[in-house]
Amino acid sequence: MRLLTIVFSNHCDLDCTYCCVQSKNLSPVNADFKQIKEFIDQYIEDEACIEFYGGEPTLHKDLVKEILDYIDSLDIDVYTRLYTNGMFKDWTDEEIVSVSNRISETLISLDGFTFEESKQRFETEDEFNQVMKNIKTVLTTSTFLGISTVLYGRAKFENMFNNYKLFRSIGVNYFSYEPLTIYNDNKPVVIPKEFFKEFLIQINRIYQDSIENYPDDTYLFVAKELLSSKWFNQGELTQCSKMVRAISPRGNVYMCRDHAANEEELFYSPKVIQFLNKNNFKNDNESFPIIEQNENNLTSCPVKNIQYRDSKMEGSLYWLEDEVQELYIEPLYRAIQALDNKRKDAYNDMLTYSKTVTKYLMKEDANEIFKVSIN
């Protein structure tokens, strides 16, 4: 499935402290429908996924509707996904319902079930309450609604299972998690071992509850920063240069939505960013030669691979050794894939292993966990 991302602008009505978009609200232009239409025409194929991304795409309500109208006019099977902070500024409930019914999947970013847990996202409790109200509105529609949580700080990890249960109680059945990175060239903070241990405990508890209580009605996603290509490499299916295209507000095409969203900072900012300039991540006649040379090497993200290479990282990532991948990460992703694909024949074995891993994690020190095997 080809992934096509439309970045409307880098403007947003929130200011999350951990946002991956730099130079926010500095887009000199907004996305242009003519350029977006040409982008879709060039790259669309049957069963492609078209993402609405930002910034905050719901700030561009009329353009969202115009693009949906154009997609509907195409005689092709397309999956659509909206990434949003859930504010839906200046949208009526009727507009939220109308557009949600036309979108395949809606992924709302939210850190927890309470305002206290989400203070890095919202200035006021009224903003948080508005998002919770909008979630309940979207749940009345046909769109596949997910909650996307960025995990940082001890409480976020410790509350994963409880928040999962609370969101389930209002009808949410799709949960996406993004742990902080394992290596500090990607983001400002490295996930500590004890937090990583807590993440593994909590995600396994969520998996176990899903299998035991909602096997036909739960979908999980964990950001692939933790993957090792030694086992995840699926050839072109996991190669961004082959499968991914993203159009920026300026109309430039990249193979990574983060590049399209951060275009002003990466390619037009007065300051020189040596890493990006020397590796040339822009489209070159439908080719991304630097990316292609570094795909499926060490991790599933070629940009991270280049960062690791430039940092003289070889063979392992920080403390996430091959043994850790084999004991915790690979089984976790295979279990999630089985759950999402409803491969019920695999449930029992994976559930047993998950419970064994959880018991082990809960009784051992974090430093020990990441250097010894489960007997």
Residue ranges and their predicted role:
Residues 8, 54-55:
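Short acidic donor-binding/metal-coordinating loop in glycosyltransferase active sites
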Residues 18, 22-25, 246, 262, ...:
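Secreted/processed peptides and extracellular or luminal domains of membrane proteins
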Residues 28-29, 34, 119-254, 258-264:
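Radical SAM enzyme [4Fe-4S]-AdoMet core and its adjacent flexible, acidic
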Residues 57-58, 255:
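Class I S-adenosyl-L-methionine
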Residues 258-375:
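Flexible mid-to-C-terminal extensions adjoining Fe-S/redox cofactors in radical SAM and related proteins
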